Amino acid sequence: MAIIGIDLGTTNSLVSYWKEGTVKLIPNSMGSVLTPSVVSVMQDEIFVGQSAKERGLTHGSETAASFKRFMGTKKKYQLGSQIFTPTELSALVLKKLKQDAEAYLNEPVEEAIITVPAYFNDRQRTDTKLAAKMAGIHVERLINEPSAAALAYQTARNQEDAVLLVLDFGGGTLDISVVECFENVIEIEAVSGDNHLGGDDVDQLLYKDFMEKHSELSLLDEEGAAGLRTALTEAKCALGKQDKLMVSYTYGTSTVEDYITQEQLLELGLPILERIRHLCAQAMRDAKCKENEIDDVIMVGGSSQLYFVQRFIEELFDRPPVVMDKTDKVVARGAGIYAGIRMRAADIKDRMMTDVCPFTLGTNVVWDKEDDRPHICPVLERNCPLPFSKTIQLYTTGDYQELMRVGIYQGEAYYADENVCLGELLIGVRRRLAGQEGIRVTFSYDINGVLQVEAENAMHQVVKKLIVNDALSEKEIEESLIQLEQLKMPDKETEEYALIHAKLEWLYQQQTGTARNQTAGMLYHLKTTREEGKHHLYVKVKEEAKQWLVQASMYLDAFEPEN
């Protein structure tokens, strides 16, 4: 029975495990350690990963991506005739990762360590654990992504004592943490972040700018727009440290060409960089840590590879940041190391990881009877160490009051209703004059970020509430499980077929004339030989299709302008 580490990412997800003194990444059924966090539905079959990503170029209405950004919300995704929540889509990704891990390790997965953004709130953490439950994965511990990154850094550098600022800039989230490492302890001092800021936002800015410069693209349909977004994203990643890179996009019989430049990215990304500056300052302020007390600034996450972001961080801290090798794999490595610790592997040093509460948790109180809007009374302030428990005393505000309603809120706003309401407790009290009767309210927050609130009145009657933040009922979970089980997760052969078919469909859209007809013929023969069970002929056609894809791609690339 194996324990694995999972980096459930906005753009890509990874699986890792500890073996023979090192952490290893597990390849998926397509041979890659990166599994795109993309889901696509085709009738009663569900595709997850690269095949789903390719289908998204030509079947956008049946495909969903970047749904991690909406964990903890009630957003719905309609894929074909089916409707999914972000939690259900995440469950499908986790199910695929578990299947690939079990196939590779040749043993069942007993448990998973799943990483989450440090700035994930209670709802988002609860939904992540629920997604794991739907995928048939037992999760004892969620760990924050910067904690995992710090663990990977400390293990790689064999560095015991250090104060680190970890900047985790992914596809859809930004986490900034001040981390202190000493002896065998990795202690989070403070976190800040934005759950809706990442590389996807850079992509959107590039897309908007490109569309404004090229009005001839205004009539692009959904699939054409998806193709352009993909081309711009690939160019952004390929730019590296070059000053500029040509983007060439073909739609129908027309081709549009333009450069993307470092200067352009810097100009478009100024609001993002200013947000990063503000969040770095907030984390350091909360940690009571000055710039000269930071030993290293660690950059992880796929979007940390963007050179204009690296330059900004270097200017901000007056030193080059440590950009971890393969930034998009660092968090997964940290999760795998922690999986080894959970397994009590003899060849790994035991480490204790502490976390903090990312948001203030409190209740609603009335300070002034003239003001009918309750204020927030902080109970656990942001960045208090976990686990943490605190008790406060609350009193009635009305004469002969029989009930007290305790709202439970998360956030930093002054007025209670401007924060996120996690739930409420109702508890009876003795009828007395205002202020003469009270209750004791205890907030307890554990290391996994699970909150329990307890209220006790003068008669020692206790009302407990485990906050699960609008989590589904057992009946709703069962209904979701039934829906997901009805969708068939394809085997390796079907997944490979879907990947080739999706690539051929995309190629068909790029071509004209004879080449397009050849691709159409390839699509037809690939489909019919498979459906008719002509195995030997299908294998032959499949290999021909692979060769055709390579040749056609080389032909298209020949028309790309020199940078």
Listing of model-derived features with the role each one plays in the protein:
Residues M1-T73, Y77-I83, L92, Q99-N563:
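Oxyanion-binding/catalytic loops of NTP- or PPi-dependent enzymes
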